[in-house]
């Protein structure tokens, strides 16, 4: 099966089923006769904008055709606990296990103000393009993550 058809099936499954994680999604794809490696499924999910959302039942994977950037921004913002800076760098504290997603989100912004990010389990180190723009970059990060970061 080609990539476009596989990604179309992923969207269809996510719109019709409550899917808690990629393993569940892979199982549903297998039931539909689609065999896919976990790494391929992960790339597909990233490319089509699948995100983890928390609802009353816990976490689930969601896909929305309606402005996925806004949805991702809101979800990532919920995961951020604080944004603090010193003279040379910015530290973002997140919920446990969520730093990688926050760092990836910031990387996808492709801002020239951000030289790069390094993510651990619950901390993201943001390296600014210029230390002269630290306060401006902190505001930019807060605006792009959430209003209350």
UniProtKB/Swiss-Prot annotation:
Disulfide bonds: none annotated. This is Arginine repressor. GO terms for cellular component: cytoplasm. It comes from the Bacteria. SUPFAM superfamilies: C-terminal domain of arginine repressor, Winged helix' DNA-binding domain. It is found in: Cytoplasm. Belongs to the ArgR family. Its main location: cytoplasm. The lineage of its organism: Bacteria, Pseudomonadati, Chlorobiota, Chlorobiia, Chlorobiales. Regulates arginine biosynthesis genes. One of its GO terms (biological process) is regulation of arginine biosynthetic process. InterPro entries: Arg_repress, Arg_repress_C, Arg_repress_C_sf, Arg_repress_DNA-bd, WH-like_DNA-bd_sf, WH_DNA-bd_sf.
